[in-house]
């Protein structure tokens, strides 16, 4: 198991593919598995590796709490796809002190080249397999509660304003008015979003911008698809 060399573009690509249908390295909450892989990555993945970049930024937000995240940090080779070998840090000997340098290391260099060739072959095979599979897009179904100011608010106009919000990765669904008391009704509206493109913060910001109609917005239900 592993991701190849996480300091290389090929290794980051493996990580990106692995996270295409996952929020975390293991399970459904941040854990020491995420910390171990995060620390092996030298910096933010490029923008075209959207799944890896999403995960990196999310785990980075736990920087102060990482020691308290659940689980036990294990070797990198215990995480990731089963058919990829971990090679991150295989070049760490470059940082040794001069006293530790093997002046007769030609055999090791030959072995290193052989290991590199095998690794590149395995990664090429893995990429070939992944290329044949359709990319999975992580989506969520969200139910929003949109509350008006009072019973005189034009709810038809309020819904028109909400549905006027358009974004790549956002699809509006069914809606209904739900009584909340004192003659006031709230708008309950369903939407499906692509997780990497649309978030609840963005929805709240744009919906509450219609301040003539909208008092507040809450997430009533959130489910991964």
Curated annotation (Swiss-Prot):
The modification Phosphoserine is found at residues 8, 42, 95, 106, 174. Belongs to the EF-1-beta/EF-1-delta family. EF-1 is composed of 4 subunits: alpha, beta (alpha subunit of the eEF1B subcomplex), delta (beta subunit of the eEF1B subcomplex), and gamma (gamma subunit of the eEF1B subcomplex). Interacts with elongation factor EEF1A1. Residues 80-114 are annotated as: Disordered. The modification N6-acetyllysine is found at residue 7. It holds the Pfam family EF1_GNE. The modification Phosphothreonine is found at residues 88, 93. Residues 2-84 form the GST C-terminal domain. Catalytic subunit of the guanine nucleotide exchange factor (GEF) (eEF1B subcomplex) of the eukaryotic elongation factor 1 complex (eEF1). Stimulates the exchange of GDP for GTP on elongation factor 1A (eEF1A), probably by displacing GDP from the nucleotide binding pocket in eEF1A. This is Elongation factor 1-beta. It comes from Oryctolagus cuniculus (Rabbit). SUPFAM superfamilies: eEF-1beta-like, GST C-terminal domain-like. Keywords: Acetylation, Elongation factor, Isopeptide bond, Phosphoprotein, Protein biosynthesis, Ubl conjugation. It comes from the Eukaryota. There is a cross-link at residue 147 (Glycyl lysine isopeptide (Lys-Gly) (interchain with G-Cter in SUMO2)). Residues 96-113 have a biased composition (Acidic residues). Phosphorylation affects the GDP/GTP exchange rate.
């Amino acid at each position: 198991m592993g991701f190849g060399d996480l300091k290389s573009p090929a290794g980051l690509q493996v990580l990106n593919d692995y996270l295409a249908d996952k929020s975390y390295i293991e399970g459904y909450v941040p854990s020491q598995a995420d910390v171990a892989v995060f620390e092996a990555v030298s910096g933010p993945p490029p923008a075209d590796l959207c799944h890896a970049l999403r995960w990196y930024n999310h785990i980075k937000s736990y920087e102060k709490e990482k020691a308290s995240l659940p689980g036990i940090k294990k070797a990198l080779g215990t995480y990731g796809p089963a058919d990829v070998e971990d090679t991150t840090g295989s070049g760490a000997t470059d940082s040794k002190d001069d006293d530790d340098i093997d002046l007769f290391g030609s055999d090791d260099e030959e072995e290193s080249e052989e290991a590199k060739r095998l690794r590149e072959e395995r990664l090429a095979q893995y990429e070939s397999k992944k290329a044949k599979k359709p990319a999975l897009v992580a989506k969520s179904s969200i139910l929003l509660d949109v509350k008006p100011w009072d019973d005189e608010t034009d709810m038809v106009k309020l819904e028109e304003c909400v549905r006027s919000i358009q974004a790549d990765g956002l699809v509006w669904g069914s809606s209904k008015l739900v009584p909340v008391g004192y003659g006031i009704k709230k708008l309950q509206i369903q939407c499906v979003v692509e997780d990497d493109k649309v978030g609840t913060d963005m929805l709240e910001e744009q919906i509450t911008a219609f301040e003539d109609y909208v008092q507040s917005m809450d997430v009533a239900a959130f489910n991964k698809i």
